[in-house]
Regions:
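Acyl-donor (CoA/ACP) binding surface of acyl/acetyltransferases
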Residues: 1-24, 57-156
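Conserved GNAT-fold acetyl-CoA-binding loop/helix
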Residues: 24-46
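A short, aromatic/hydrophobic, helix- or strand-capping loop or linear motif
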Residues: 28-33, 55-61
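Short loop/turn motifs at secondary-structure junctions and domain boundaries
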Residues: 48-53
Length: 156
């Protein structure tokens, strides 16, 4: 299995949209916009993100197929990372490898991340990449329709 990162292209949008509509993936991602599965809203959101020079949005490619996306972006002048892996690819080390590759592209530290506190898989990915837990917060999770706890992590 060969994992690589590449720039997101127009032709990737259909596959990325379809991966993003999986109900279990939405539940685990938790902190997503309320209109996440609306195709027009998805295309508008992707257009905004792709036009923003502070966002590095990449496709996770596994053996020539789209396995998900990974991005770095800024919130309140802090560098954060996020990723989404197609549920059919969970548990194969793809997110861990993609995150290590993305982190190798920047020397900037600290890097921040957040995950639903019950998303054990995502927390494991972040910790394998060297992130450590630095706090918890509560917030409304659009993917669950309720307020839940999220874990805040940092890589120094």
């Amino acid at each position: 299995m060969h994992v690589s990162l590449r720039p997101l292209e127009d032709g990737d949008l259909d596959a990325i949209y379809e991966q993003g509509t999986d109900p279990e993936s939405i539940r685990m991602a938790a902190f997503i916009p309320p209109n996440w599965t609306d195709r027009a809203a998805f295309l508008a959101r992707m257009s905004r993100l792709r036009a923003d020079p502070s966002v590095s949005n990449r496709v996770i490619d596994v053996d020539g197929a789209i396995a998900g996306t990974i991005a770095s972006f800024r919130i309140d002048d802090q560098l954060e990372v996020t990723y989404w892996v197609d549920r059919a690819q969970w548990g194969k080390g793809i997110a861990t490898e993609a995150l290590r590759m993305l982190l190798a592209e920047t020397a900037e530290r600290p890097v921040h991340a957040r995950a639903a506190s019950d998303n054990v898989g995502s927390l494991r990915v972040l910790e394998k990449a060297g992130f450590r837990r630095v706090g918890v917060d509560r917030g409304f999770a659009g993917g669950r329709g309720e307020e839940i706890e999220e874990t805040i992590l940092r890589l120094d």
